[in-house]
Amino acid sequence: MNSSYLNFKDKHILVVGDVMLDRYWHGGTSRISPEAPVQVVKVSSIEDRPGGAANVALGLAKLGVSVTLVGVVGNDENADVLARCLEDAGVICRFVRSETLPTITKLRVMSRHQQLIRLDFEEREDSLSQNEALAKVVEECLPKSDAVIFSDYAKGCLADVQSLIKLSNAAKVPSFVDPKGNDFSIYQGATLVKPNLLEFETIVGKCSSTKELEEKAKALREQFGWKALLVTRGEDGLILLSDDKPPFSLATAAKEVFDVTGAGDTVVAVLTAVYVTSKRFIDAVEYANQAAGYVVGKLGTASISAERLDAIMFQRSHNTNFGVLSPKDLLEQIKLAQMNGEKIVFTNGCFDILHPGHIAYMKQAKALGDRLIVAVNTDASVKRLKGEKRPINNLIHRMSVLEGVGSIDWVTWFDEDTPKEIIEFLTPDVLVKGGDYTIETIVGADHVLAHGGEVKVLTFVDGYSTTSIIEKANL
C-alpha cells in the first residue's frame, strides 16, 4: 500500500474490554524507613493514565478516529478520573457502573525512573446482570461503528465475549480481538485475533520453527472461523494468516527498544483503524508494525498520530538514504556524511505552497555546504502557527514536493512550534534562515555556534510569499 494521508476522522470504532486506571506516584528517595527496611518515597507528583482497553481507545483517538469505549467500572472516584482523562482526549465513555466492584486501578510508586512497587486494586465478578448490561450497551453502539475491538485482559468484562462477537457479526461489524487466557474458543467467529507469541503457544504448544508456527496458526484460524490470525513475536516480527493466502511475515520495525508498555494496544488500534480504511489485512499489518516500532522506541506508554504514522510509511516506501527521512534515520546519514568531510546545511519552514522564491532560497542555502536538510513543520504545528485554515497542503504533499527540488538532499519533519529540538538533535554545520532575522534571534543558533558551526541569514526574493498567493487565490 502506497503511503497516503489516511483520513480516520470519518471512521467510528467501538472498543469493549477491561478498562483500567494506571496511576503513578513519583517522588524522591533519600532514606530508609525507621519502621521497616524499606525506602521512604516523598511523593512529589501524581499521574493518571488510561490503561487496558482504555489505552486502546486513547490510541485510536490520537489517530483521529471517533471512538466509543464500553467497559465495567466501579461507582467510585477513580472511574470519574478515568472518564475525565478519556473524554479530554475525545473518547465517548459508555461505562457500566458496578456497585460491588472497584474500578481496576494499578498504582505504581516510581523513583528515579524506576518502579519500586505496584499495587493492584481489582476484584472479579462474573454476573449475569453485568453481562446483560454490557451487551445492551454494545448492541446500541454497533450500528454506528465501522469496527469493534475486544480488548481482553482477563479481568471479567469479556466473560461472555462470544455473545458480543455474535452481536457484532449480526450487525455486520468486523471484530478485532486482543486475546487473553488458555481458551480461544470464546473468540470463535471474530474477524481477526491478535495474540502475542506467548499467548499463541499457550493454546497450541511450543513451536520449534516458523514453519510449525505457521501450520498451527493456519489450523487454529480454520478451527475457530477467523478471517485472519496475527501472531506478534516481538523482535522476530509478525506473521499474518488470512483466508487462503500464504502466510505473510514482517520483520520488526523497531530499531531500538526502550519500553514495550502498550505496544500490543498500539498494534490492535492501528491495525483496526487502517483496516476500516483500506479493507486489506496486509496494509493494516504493515502500518501496525511501523507504529509498534515507533512506540517501543519511547519511554513509557506512547501513542502515535495519523500524521506521524503516515510520514513514517512515506519514508519507508521511498527506502533510500536521501529524500524523506525520519529525524532518527537522518541523524545516521548526517554522521556518515560528516565522516566523509561533507558540510551539512539546515533550514526549516512550513513550505505550504512552494513558489520561485523558495526555490531560489534553497539554491542559496545549498551553496553554503555539501548537503541541504529541509525540516518541515507538521500539520498540527502549522495550525498552531498559522491558524486553523492552514496548511493548504498536508505534510505528505509538502514533503513530496520538496523532495523533488534538486538542491535539497534530505527532507524531515518536526512537531514542535520551533525547530529548537530537531536542530539540537541533528547539530548541522550551517544553520540558515531567510528574512529579517539577526543571528541572535534565530532559534537554535546558540547550539550550532557552540558546536563550531555557522549561522547565516539569507535574503528572500522580493515579490513572492505564501500568504499573498493564498490571499490572491481566496483559499
Curated annotation (Swiss-Prot):
Chain positions covered by the region annotation Ribokinase: 1-320
GO (cellular component) term, any one: cytosol
Annotated catalytic residues: 265
Segments of this protein annotated with the region Cytidylyltransferase: 346-475
InterPro entries: Bifunc_HldE (IPR023030), Carboh/pur_kinase_PfkB_CS (IPR002173), Cyt_trans-like (IPR004821), PfkB_dom (IPR011611), RfaE_dom_I (IPR011913), RfaE_dom_II (IPR011914), Ribokinase-like (IPR029056), Rossmann-like_a/b/a_fold (IPR014729)
Keywords, in A-Z order: ATP-binding, Carbohydrate metabolism, Kinase, Multifunctional enzyme, Nucleotide-binding, Nucleotidyltransferase, Transferase
Gene Ontology molecular function, alphabetical: ATP binding; heptose 7-phosphate kinase activity; heptose-1-phosphate adenylyltransferase activity; phosphotransferase activity, alcohol group as acceptor
Biological or metabolic pathway of the protein: Nucleotide-sugar biosynthesis; ADP-L-glycero-beta-D-manno-heptose biosynthesis; ADP-L-glycero-beta-D-manno-heptose from D-glycero-beta-D-manno-heptose 7-phosphate: step 1/4; Nucleotide-sugar biosynthesis; ADP-L-glycero-beta-D-manno-heptose biosynthesis; ADP-L-glycero-beta-D-manno-heptose from D-glycero-beta-D-manno-heptose 7-phosphate: step 3/4
Swiss-Prot/TrEMBL catalytic activity: D-glycero-beta-D-manno-heptose 7-phosphate + ATP = D-glycero-beta-D-manno-heptose 1,7-bisphosphate + ADP + H(+); D-glycero-beta-D-manno-heptose 1-phosphate + ATP + H(+) = ADP-D-glycero-beta-D-manno-heptose + diphosphate
A Pfam family: CTP_transf_like
Keyword Phosphoprotein: no
EC number: 2.7.1.167, 2.7.7.70
Keyword Transcription attributed: no
Superkingdom, natural source: Bacteria
GO BP term (any one): ADP-L-glycero-beta-D-manno-heptose biosynthetic process
Chain sites annotated for binding ATP: 196-199
Subunit structure: Homodimer.
UniProt function note: Catalyzes the ADP transfer from ATP to D-glycero-beta-D-manno-heptose 1-phosphate, yielding ADP-D-glycero-beta-D-manno-heptose.
Record-stated family: In the N-terminal section; belongs to the carbohydrate kinase PfkB family. In the C-terminal section; belongs to the cytidylyltransferase family.
Protein name: Bifunctional protein HldE
Species of the source: Marinomonas sp. (strain MWYL1)
Primary gene name: hldE
